Amino acid sequence: MNSAALIETITQLISPLITAQGLKLWGIELINIPQPIIKIFVDTIETNRLHENNIINSKSEQITIEQCASLSRLIGLTLEVEELFPNKWTLEVSSPGLERSFFTIQQLSNYINHDIDVTLKEQHPLWPNRKKFYGTLISITDNTFMLNLSLAHRKSDEPENVSINWQQVRKATLVHHFFQPNKKLGSTKGLNGGTT
């Protein structure tokens, strides 16, 4: 069974357990070396509601250590019974965190106007030698999304916006900016001496 099929099987097995706890499955990550590590990311319904309404802060309802521990026991027992992994494996259950990774393009829809850090599987077809992009998410379609790149994250002669197909993405992560009361916004120095 390949990784994608394995993740789909695990999703079907554990989603009812997570929903029964009043939580939501955010994503699953598999690491196969040197032994399988199954990372399960779960979120609270309240946190998802706040994100849907563009309210993102560190004071929103957080999943507790007790909830993660309880789910870890339930999920661990389920995976043992199903015998999906023939050898020793490790299970980790946690919140996605403020700087969360995205597992589907649909998850991006709640984060318009937020900064995203993206690594591609290979060089972007229109940006030679570029696999990494950091910018503000400005739009999403069915299969693509667009980032606005400040001068701090591009050369002055490069386009401001980059369109990325989700199938190209190796990893996409939300960038959380912690509030700094004495820092003036919009004063990041650009590569060519300008400010953004």
From Swiss-Prot:
Cross-referenced InterPro entries: Ribosome_maturation_RimP (IPR003728), RimP_C (IPR028998), RimP_C_sf (IPR036847), RimP_N (IPR028989), RimP_N_sf (IPR035956)
Gene Ontology cellular component annotations, sorted alphabetically: cytosol
Keyword Electron transport: no
Annotated CDD domains: YlxS_C (cd01734)
One Pfam assignment: RimP_N
Family to which the UniProt record says this protein belongs: Belongs to the RimP family.
HAMAP family the UniProt entry points to: RimP
PANTHER family named in the record: RIBOSOME MATURATION FACTOR RIMP (PTHR33867:SF1)
Task performed by this protein: Required for maturation of 30S ribosomal subunits.
Name used for this protein in its record: Ribosome maturation factor RimP
